[in-house]
């Protein structure tokens, strides 16, 4: 893994530091990206939410995923787009009441993600 991708964003008038981790969805192997934020009280990275969503019947390329625009803070998505970490493919898929965009993640972003197997000590430094 390269240097971890870290951003700062505002949510409900509070500033948060965020890092990202990757795994895969069990049913289809699609890329999962989660968001963690630095907890000032516990002084460690804690799960915050999902950047991606798994849509039924969809198989994505290894560097692609559908963004969870229903639950992820819009500022996180905006920052990642502005930094060139995600690129809109122009493809969308509906699920429930939402329409989710398919994005392509940059190699730099993917190389800066922690994996679920990474040691906590390495991650929390």
Residue locations for each model-derived region?
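Short, compact, well-ordered microdomains
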Residues: 69-120
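Non-Sec secretion/translocation targeting segments of pathogen effectors
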Residues: 123-125
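Catalytic phosphate/metal-binding cores of nucleic-acid and nucleotide-processing enzymes, i.e., regions
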Residues: 4, 11, 17-38, 42-50
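Acidic, aromatic-enriched beta-alpha/helix-loop junctions
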Residues: 34-84
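A generic structural micro-environment signature
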Residues: 26, 59-61, 92, 111
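Alpha-helical interaction segments
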Residues: 10-11, 75
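Short, acidic/polar N-cap/turn motifs at the starts of alpha helices
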Residues: 4-6, 100
């Amino acid at each position: 893994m390269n240097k971890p991708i870290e951003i700062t964003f505002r949510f409900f008038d509070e500033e948060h530091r965020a890092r990202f981790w990757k795994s895969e969805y069990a049913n289809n192997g699609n890329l999962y990206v989660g968001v963690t934020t630095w907890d000032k009280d516990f002084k460690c990275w804690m799960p915050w939410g999902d950047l991606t969503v798994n849509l039924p019947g969809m198989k994505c390329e290894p560097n692609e995923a559908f963004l969870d625009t229903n639950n992820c803070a819009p500022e996180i998505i905006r920052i990642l787009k502005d930094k060139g970490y995600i690129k809109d493919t122009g493809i969308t898929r509906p699920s429930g009441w939402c329409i989710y965009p398919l994005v392509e993640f940059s190699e730099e972003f993917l190389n800066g993600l922690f994996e679920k197997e990474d040691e906590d000590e390495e991650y929390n430094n």
